[in-house]
Structures are given as C-alpha cells and as structure tokens.
Amino acid sequence: MAAQALALLREVSRLEAPLEELRALQSLLQSVPLSELREQAAELRLGPLFSLLNENHREQTTLCVSILERLLQALEPVHVARNLRVDLQRGLTHPNDSVKILTLSQVGRIVENSDAVTEILNNAELLKQIVYCIGGENLSVAKTAIKSLSRISLTQAGLEALFESNLLDDLKSVMKTNDIVRYRVYELIVEISSVSPESLNCCTTSGLVTQLLRELTGEDVLVRATCIEMVTSLACTHHGRQYLAQEGVIDQISNIIVGADADPFSSFYLPGFVKFFGNLAIMDSPQQICERYPIFMEKVFEMTESQDPTMIGVAVDTIGILGSNVEGKQVLQKTGTRFERLLMKIGYQAKNASTELKIRCLDALSSLFYLPPEQTDDLLRMTESWFSSLSRDPLELFRGISNQPFPELHCAALKVFTAIANQPWAQKLMFNSPGFVEYVMDRSVEHDKASKDAKYELVKALANSKTIAEIFGNPNYLRLRTYLSEGPYYVKPISTTAVEGAE
C-alpha cells in the first residue's frame, strides 16, 4: 500500500491540477501504517505538495494539509528541519491558518528533538516568522507559536537566540499589534521566566518583565486584572517569588488591596489580587504571609459578606487553598469566632447558592476538613468544631445536596464525606445517622462514572481507617472491604429462575 501511495505522490507531482489524485492519496494514506511509510521515507518527495499549497484553491489546500500531516510524521525531525526549511518558512506566512498550524506542528516536533533544534536556532528568518505568528488573529496559531518559542528557550542557545539578537526587537514589535497580542507576549515571557533563575534574568534584562509589572501596578483596572494572572503564574516558582519580593511587587499589590475600598472599580482586579496572595501563602508559609500582609485575610473575610457571587466565590476558593495544609488551617483557627461565622456563611451558600457556587463551597470544605493520617487530638477537635459550625445538622445538609440530580453536586458532596472519613468523630456521626451506612453501601444511587468513582473513594477512605471496625462494627467493616475489592463499577448479577412452560 505504501508503494501505491508513492505512485500517487509521483502522479501528483506531474500534474497541474491533481485534485482527483489528491483525493485518492488522502483516502489511501488513512489505511497505510506509519511504519510502512517510514520504511519509504527516503522516497517521499514532498516539495510538489508544498508547492500546491501556494495556489489559491481551498479544497486543494485542505487535501494537501491532510496528506502532509500524515507523510511528515514518517520523516525524522532532523530531516524536516534540514530539507524543508524553505517550505516551513513559507508555511508560516501562508494566509490559510491550517497551513500555519501544520507548519508550527512540525516546528514543535523539531524543537522537541535535541539534534534538530539547532537547525532552527541557526535559521533567524524562521524564528522571526514564529514570533510574528503570535500576532495572528487565530488563537491556535498564536498558542502553538508560544509553545514552540517556550520550548526553544529551555537551552542556553535558545535563550541567546531569543534575547540577544534582533529577535527581541521583533518580539517588541509584535507586542504593538494590540492589547491581546501584548498579553500573549507577556504569557510567553512568564513561561520562559518560570523555568530557572537564568531564564528569569534574561527576561528581566530584556525589559519585558519590568513592563509587565509596570502595567500591573498602573491605573488601568482591566489591565491590572489581566496582568495579575500572569504574575501569579510567575509566583508559582521559588525564584519568581524571590524576584517579586526583591522588587517590592508583593508590597505594592498589598497596598493596592489596602486602597481598594476607595476605588469604585476595584471589583475588576480585587479577585485576582486576593487569589495571588492565596497562592503565595500556600506555596510559602501561610502564617508568614498572613502576618506580613494582614490586609489579605481581612479582605477575604470582607468578601464573604459581599452580595456579589463573584467575590464570594473567590473568597471561598481562597479559604480552601489556605486551609489545604495544616499550617493554613491553624492560621484560620486563630481567627476564632470570626472563622466560625464564615463557616456558617459557607454552609448557607452550599445549600442556597447557584450550582456553580455550591460546588466551589463544597470543594473548599473538602480542603478545609481533610487531615493527613498523622492526626492529633487538637486537630481533630478543630475539624469537629468547624463541622458543627456549618449548620444545625451538617451531615444531613451534605446528604441532601448529594441527593440532588446533578452529578457535579453529588460528587462534590461525596468529596466532603471522603475528607472527614478517616476522623473518628465523623465516623461516629455517620454511624449514628439513620440510613447513612446503607447509603454508603448502596451502589444504585450512582449512575455515572464520576459519581461511582467518588463513592468508591469514600468507601476506600472509610475501609482503610484504623478506627472504622471499632466504630462501624465488624459486619459493616467487612461490607466496606467487599465493596472495595469489587471495585467502583461492580454490578450485582440478577438471578433468574426458569419456569417450566413459560414463553
């Protein structure tokens, strides 16, 4: 079959308008194994196919792109980089986005190959065209270009090619296209900066990181909202956080939050700024961040009082992030009755808010209540106290939510049960709640895969607890172990009895 494909390819190269042959070749290639094509790689002459892309014929272009996608997979990245460099350059400037995406996918293969990537680094014109793809209208083209440039920058040679040549001027030129393209370049810069201190140094020397930070703390509230997301990504790395602290950026963000009350447009950027501190706290030390920037916690508590669901959602998410480790839980516990009142509000929202906000509340509560296996009496007393602050009967609250006909809500409620399943006080509550043990064992409640998986995780957490046999009793413990061994998707066989004479 590969021989047939080669014959058709030769036929295509002879003809001026080979539409029928292209259709036949595309159809044939779908059934030719890639291994066979690789054996014939030396015979693949792709130049004519690339030439056909230059004609303004939509179907012909579509067919050629489809054929090239298949045939190029049979060629080694080094071969593509060395022998098709002119075709790649043309492809990046082609008016049809599918041709650009095809070309960029090959660039992606090349930059992943340590032998082939050198060919691209030595091709200034090709690099320039990749940079200019960031400025295109098609988001897929831009994203693929960003990914390729980010991959190129993983080596010292790649960093030098990007930041110590005319390419930096091209990057700055592309940024001037419009606001959207400027943010795409910032996205690339943050991706590169996050790799290592050396990468960050190259990006700061270029002036682009400074420009991003200047926009973050500038007067345009919409720009602030966009820039804080990128700065939060940079803060995900230790060297990124160090840099932001040294440059005084974290203090500036804190000061902007302090002044937010006097800004009628603060709702545009405040959620992102609060998220920034939430992520910062969990990656460094919740206690240190909350002590150094008290406005952060103050604002989170304030946002839970808001009438704006967006503000409430961000506050709830942040509480969940902060309470995801023991130190963060202890920071929240130190706020005393204020946190208990906040929990009551979360309990109310979990019952009465929109489905989306209910799920966010349940996810936050799962994070807050979860304790690692090394539990102390103090931590257990704390989570039990928190649980009782949610409502008059929190266990029934979550059972009620889990019975609603929405799989996402059902799974989120099961996650809360799973979070407390290894804590003795919760096991006693479950055991003493009428019908709860049967509810856990009942497989007929869950109908979709996600729900079955979530129920299985709950059963696993209970069955693996050291205290469960004593609290639930041995018969129930054995039922849990049976459920566990049968797996999440077990269906009990229905026994049928044959009756003589029945039709």
Swiss-Prot record:
It comes from the Eukaryota. One of its GO terms (cellular component) is proteasome accessory complex. Gene3D superfamilies: Leucine-rich Repeat Variant. InterPro entries: ARM-like, ARM-type_fold, PSMD5. Keywords: Acetylation, Chaperone. Pfam families: Proteasom_PSMB. GO terms for biological process: proteasome assembly. The modification N-acetylalanine is found at A2. Rich in dileucine repeats, which have been implicated in trafficking of a variety of transmembrane proteins. PANTHER family: 26S PROTEASOME NON-ATPASE REGULATORY SUBUNIT 5, 26S PROTEASOME NON-ATPASE REGULATORY SUBUNIT 5-RELATED. Interacts with PSMC1, PSMC2, PSMD1 and PSMD6. Part of transient complex containing PSMD5, PSMC2, PSMC1 and PSMD2 formed during the assembly of the 26S proteasome. Belongs to the proteasome subunit S5B/HSM3 family. Acts as a chaperone during the assembly of the 26S proteasome, specifically of the base subcomplex of the PA700/19S regulatory complex (RC). In the initial step of the base subcomplex assembly is part of an intermediate PSMD5:PSMC2:PSMC1:PSMD2 module which probably assembles with a PSMD10:PSMC4:PSMC5:PAAF1 module followed by dissociation of PSMD5. This is 26S proteasome non-ATPase regulatory subunit 5.
